[in-house]
Structures are given as C-alpha cells and as structure tokens.
Amino acid sequence: MAETELCHKLDLLLRTGSLLMESAADTSRILRTMKRAMAFLGLDERYIHLYVNWNVLMVNYSDELHSFTKFQRCERHGISLATIAKVSRLTWTAIREDFSLVQYEKALDDIHDAPRGFTPWQVAIGGGFACGGFCIQFGCDWTAFFYCSLAAILGFRLRMFLPTMGCNNYVAIGISAFVATLLAWATALLSTDPAMMAGMPSWMISTTPWHPLMACALFIVPGVPLINFVSDMLDGYIETGFIRAVNTLLMVLAMAFGIAFAIKVCGIDNFAKTLTMTPHHEYWEYAIAAAVSAMGFSTIFNIPRRLLPVVAVGGIIAVCVRNFINLGPSNGNLGLDMGLTIGSLAGATAVSIAVIKARHWFHVPHQCITIPSVIPMIPGVLMYRALFAFIEMHGVVGEVTVGMNNAIKASLAIICIALGVAVPNLFFRRFIEDTRKRKLLAMLVERKKRNGEFVTPHAVGVRQGAHRRTRKEKKHARDTHE
C-alpha cells in the first residue's frame, strides 16, 4: 500500500469518527463504526491503534513497512441522531456496494454538509412544547401547559440566537433560563393577580399557575450527554465519560444561576423548593404529554422526520410504565408505588427491549430511537433544585440535606435510565456479535470476488474455524464447571 493512499485512508477513518463524536454518539458506537470503516478501507485491525477523546481522535498505523500517527480535532459538538444513522448506514453500504475512496469521501462530505432537518423556529417550538409536556407530568393543567410552552419557545429561541452573536455558550444558557423563567412568571400573574383575572376568560386562568416556572427552562437540560456519560463510564471509557459529565454539570449550573437571578427579580421561589411535582392526571394525559415531549426533544436532536411517530410511541411506553411503577396509593394515584428510581429503570428497559426489534424495521441504530424516547423521564427539575439548594444556602439546618436528597434522587434516576437503555441492547449485541462478524466477513469476501481478487477458502475457514473452536471451548468449560 502506497504511503499516500494509506494516509488518505487514515484521514477518512478519522473523519468518520469525528462526525460521530461531534453528533453525540457514545464511545462504544464510535469505535464499532470506525472498525467497520477500517474493514471497508482495507486496514488490517492488527496494525491499527485507536484513541477516542472528547476533543481529539487519534489513529496509529504500524506494520512492517509503515508507522503513521494522525490526529483529528472535534470542535463542533452538537447532537444529530440523523448523522449517526447516516454514518452507520454508510459503512455497511460502502462495503456492500464496493465504494471507491472517492465515493466514500463524497458521502462523508454530503453527510457533513447536509442541513439539519428542522429550522431554528421549528426546533424552538418543538422544544417549547416538550417543556410543556414535562409540566403536565409535574401536575399542571392544560392552560399552564400552553403558558409553559410559550415561555420555553421564546427562551429557547434566544438560547439559539445568542451564540450566533458571539456569546459564550454557558452565558447564553444562563440568560435564556433567566428570560424563560421571567416569562413564565409573567404568565402566572394572569391567574394570580385579581385585577388581571377580572378581565380574563375562564379558559385562560390556570389552577396551577406556578408550575410553568418549574419546567420552562428544561430545554437546556442535556439529556443525551447525561445518558452517554453513564454509558461511557459503564463501558470503561472513563476519561471521555468524565468530560461529558463535567460539560453537563456546567450547563445545568449555568441554568441554575439563570433561574436564581430570575427568582431575585420576581420574588417567587416555591417552584425551586417546595412546589409539588406529583401529578394527578389520567394515563391518557400522561401519554399525550409524553408523545409531545419525545417528539419535541427529537427536533433538538435532529432525528429523521420519519421517526417522529416512532419516538412518540417510545415516549408513551417509557413514561406510562415509569408512572405506573413510580406512582401509587400513597400519593393518590393508580400504580405500584415503587418510587422514581425503579420506575425510571423499568420505563427505559421496556423501551430498549422494544427497540431491539423495531430498529430493524426502521433501519436505524438503537440509540436513535431509545434516547429520544426516554428523554421525557430525565429528572431535570431535581437536578437544578439540587444546585439551587447549594447556591441559596444560608447556614440553616437541613439545607444540605435537601440539596443532597435532590441530587441523589436525580443521579439514581439518570443512572437507571442509562442502564435501562444500555443493558438490554448490550446483551442482545453480544448475542448477535458472531452473526454480525460473519455477515461482515461474507460481505468483504464477496467484494473481493467482484473485484477479481483471489480469496482462498482456507483464509476464510481459519476465521470460521476459530469461531467454532471458541464455541467448543466455551461448551467444554461449561461442562467442566458443571
């Protein structure tokens, strides 16, 4: 292999990985997809060493004749599930249809340059109604749902506008949280101020006027990085997972400061401390709110439009299962009364198991359906309530306990959601791993035959035979153990 061609292949491999990292793929998926790209590019896995980090990817190729090390910076971090799906599909298509390097590079360029599937205002409206769906899950009425959505839409649009003017990302988060909370407070006056209520029609007066303040800034909560952080830590990618966690913490902290400043202005802080989050709705209302939240947040994640109904169904499954297990007679609801932690685990697991089959119907990675489906369960309010408790400490007995209680509840719920999403897929992926390897090997052999390259049955049989020996060894180990 010529040095120029080898360097070109390494560049393409790094570009494949950087597209995934900048689109918020978890580290395991990045490595799996890069290894599949290596197979297409004809790079021997024995000579390749990959290093994946939040800001940089590195690949080293060392054989008897060459030793090259190349780097690729990852700077434009965002969330694009459509990009993840396209890159995954490209690596399979490139092998099956025997792409040239030029074709593969053009396909990467097309994916990189493709516009997002939703306009900024569509994303703002979707994210705003998603916050309204959260508000329903916290017990608000449908009038408050629309007030919360309106405040969130305007706050979110401001959040997207400020970085285009050169504003720091975390400052933009704080400002947008401040504005959204003030707007929600202004709508609450319509239902609490007697003078305003006198001139308002009854359908515009909410019986839960303060609930929109609780949910209006939840468009900021970074649900995908939270889940990826837990997944990376569980998979052993500690460094990348830790960076994701710190970035998430800074975003939530900026949001908490924005809300704290808004509280100083409006003088109302019950939504950040004592306002109840226990809903008392019918399950059909939970289902509608979950579908709205799942589809709304999917616009933020740039999901393919055709998957919006699928994600809506996933959100309904996740939230309704969670609520049935979480709620119960102790809080005046129908359910098993087992708590938020167990409910979150059950809801995420139910969706993950369903998507194991459904992903083959829609030809997308598992992550592209499960993550938007479980986002409506992310405990964003508990997260910023925990940080707000620490920000507002005055030395009163019990303040640390309140903050730690919210922090622990939020952490356990997030861990359980990530476990519910990851574990069923992990077991299934290991179950079919040999099948996928055989499929990939067969495609590579067929590709070589089409190109007129000589493929000996012995070369293929060595790998298959090694697989059979491994299975026999496993069976022998089990028999010996028994």
What are the functions of these language-model segments?
Residues 116-198, 206-229, 305:
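Core alpha-helical transmembrane segments of integral membrane proteins
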Residues 122, 137-151, 208-222, 273-290, ...:
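Structural signature of hydrophobic alpha-helical transmembrane segments
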Residues 133-134, 138, 154-163, 179, ...:
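Alpha-helical membrane-inserting segments
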Residues 128, 148-168, 172-181, 292, ...:
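Conserved mixed alpha/beta catalytic, RNA-binding, or beta-rich assembly cores of soluble enzyme
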Residues 124-125, 145-150, 171-175, 214, ...:
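Hydrophobic alpha-helical transmembrane segments
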Residues 1-106, 110-112:
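Soluble N-terminal domains of membrane-associated systems
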